[in-house]
Structures are given as C-alpha cells and as structure tokens.
Regions:
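Charge-rich, low-complexity N-terminal segments
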Residues: 1-106
Length: 106
C-alpha cells in the first residue's frame, strides 16, 4: 500500500503535467491526455501514462520521443509550480489499460 504522501505527490503530478504539456509548441503532445502517474523510489522516478488511442504505433513512438525531449521543460514547470527542490525523473508510457477494457467489453 502506498503512503499518503506518495499518493498526494501522484495526484499533484496528475494536475501539473497536463498544464506543463499545454504550454509546449508541439501539437501532438500539448493536449495529450494523462491517465495516470506512478511514483517509484519516493519522488525520484515517476512513470507517466498517457492515452494514445488516437495514434498508431509509429506515432506513439514519435510522441514518446517528443515527451523525452520536453522532459526538462516539464520538470522545470513542475518545480516552479510546487516549490520542490527536486522533481522526479519522468518516464512516459502508453496506457494499454483502456484498450484492454475495450476488448473485454466487446
């Protein structure tokens, strides 16, 4: 079970990461829906899940590369908004849970 502080951190990142993405110039990622954040090792690492149902496999790879390039900008926006001294290292992954649930419904 996760500690309450870790859950708060994840919840805060769920709000701040889409705000940071919306300020970027890349049209593929500035309105990307973030579906979840999973913090590991305290606040040192965070896996950020996004909904890529609108993209094919090649476009998902491009989106992940764009997110990797924008990682520093996202981290600086999160740091400015929170006042933390350290921001987690973000790893972006496609959320496959939505696709699995659609298959179950069909």
């Amino acid at each position: 079970m996760k500690s309450i502080n870790l859950q708060r951190t994840e919840s805060l990142l769920m709000e701040l990461i889409p705000q940071a993405l919306s300020q970027l110039q890349n049209s593929k990622i500035n309105s990307l829906p973030i579906t979840g954040v999973n913090c590991k090792n305290g606040k040192y690492d965070a896996i950020v899940y996004f909904d890529g149902s609108d993209f094919d496999k090649d476009e998902v790879k491009e989106v992940i590369e764009s997110l990797k390039k924008a990682n520093g900008r996202i981290k600086s926006d999160v740091l400015a908004s929170t006042g933390w001294y350290k921001c987690p290292n973000f790893k972006f992954e496609l959320d496959t849970y939505l696709e699995k649930s659609k298959k179950i419904e069909d």
